[in-house]
């Protein structure tokens, strides 16, 4: 790669490393509708199986409605003593990713692709986020008056991060559970690249 390409890759690599699941935010930092629409614009340009584009979105930056969405989510299963962020550290906005059964009954991995893309976009904006699949779907559908043909797939919580997150190499015990130290630094164990590659067929 030429130097400019190397620099671009290094920048992208840095954004990916920063794009951790952030669960504590500065709730005083407001996120407006325009910002959320920009993220939906990124999702619009993502790949979609058979180009069906079956995903729809609900955006929320209203404080009262955000509080209701918050109560529909399961926060950090491995941190059993932690019930989620206190009010001043809650997300400032949410994006709900929905599968539209009027378009297709198969959503494949489209929602994962768009969720990751929007979270990367949020990091470029200086924001952080967390992707939720632990959702009380019945409660969320009632809270947001979601039509029957729309199926909640993921919820993105967004805000200005106040959490320090550190990537660690998985220890000899093989424990993959994230944890927090006495300084509230959030540690995320990751497998080494060598463990991930199970076959190599390269001659250069």
Question: Which residues make up each language-model segment?
Answer:
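Acidic, surface-exposed loops and disordered segments
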Residues: 1-204
């Amino acid at each position: 790669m030429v130097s400019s390409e190397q620099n671009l890759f290094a920048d992208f690599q840095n954004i990916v490393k920063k794009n951790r699941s952030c669960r504590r935010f500065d709730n005083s930092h407001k996120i407006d509708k325009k910002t959320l629409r920009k993220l939906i614009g990124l999702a619009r340009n993502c790949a979609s199986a058979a180009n069906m584009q079956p995903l729809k979105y609900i955006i929320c930056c209203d404080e009262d409605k955000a509080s209701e969405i918050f109560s529909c989510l399961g926060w950090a299963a491995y941190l059993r003593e932690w019930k989620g962020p206190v009010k001043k550290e809650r997300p400032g906005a949410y994006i709900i990713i929905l599968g539209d059964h009027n378009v297709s009954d198969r959503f494949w991995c489209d929602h994962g692709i768009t969720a990751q893309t929007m979270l990367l976009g949020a990091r470029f904006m200086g924001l952080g986020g967390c992707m939720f699949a632990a959702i009380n779907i019945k409660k969320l559908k009632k809270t947001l008056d979601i039509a029957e043909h729309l199926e909640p797939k993921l919820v993105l919580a967004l805000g200005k991060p106040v959490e320090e997150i550190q990537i660690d190499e998985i220890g000899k015990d093989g424990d993959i559970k994230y944890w927090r130290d006495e300084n509230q630094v959030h540690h995320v164990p990751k497998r080494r690249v060598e463990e991930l590659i199970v076959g190599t067929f390269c001659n250069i």
